[in-house]
Amino acid sequence: MKTNRDITYLKKCKICGNKNLKKVLFINEQYISATFVKTNINNKLTKIKTPLTLVLCDKSKKSDGCGLLQLYEITKPDLLYRKYFYRSATNDTMRKDLKNVVSSVEKIAKPKKNDIIVDIGSNDCTLLNFYKKKYRLVGFEPARNINYINKGRKIKVFKNYFNYKD
């Protein structure tokens, strides 16, 4: 049961605007998110299904495309992210992986004191908490139901999507 309000469809490439999109993979209808959790039984998400179709922006000689692989179905972001159930801090493997990401960033980018480090989709700020205190840490997280972890660091969290306004 999908409605036009919940799911729209890609009309052109998100990067270059090319309208020539080739279907690469089609998967029959799936629940959009979190529907296996018992606490979500009465949630609207348990009633919304959509197929998953990957499309490729055609970059052949006949087209001016960029080759981006993208999802054809677009689910309304608030349905997916305003009440998000996963927390990075609860998973030991995720914590280790995020710590490794921070280590790699510090080795490659070599940020300096007071540099701004931004985490888009910061969840509970697990990743940002692995950075040294000398940086200015900023997170963007649209989920309204997540408590942010702040282990003695000044982390500025925007409870919204990353956008041009904030």
Predicted stretch roles:
Residues 95-114:
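Conserved alpha-helix/loop element of class I SAM-dependent methyltransferases that forms part
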Residues 136-141:
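Conserved SAM-binding motif I beta-strand of class I
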Residues 153-165:
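Conserved SAM-binding strand-loop segment of SAM-dependent methyltransferases
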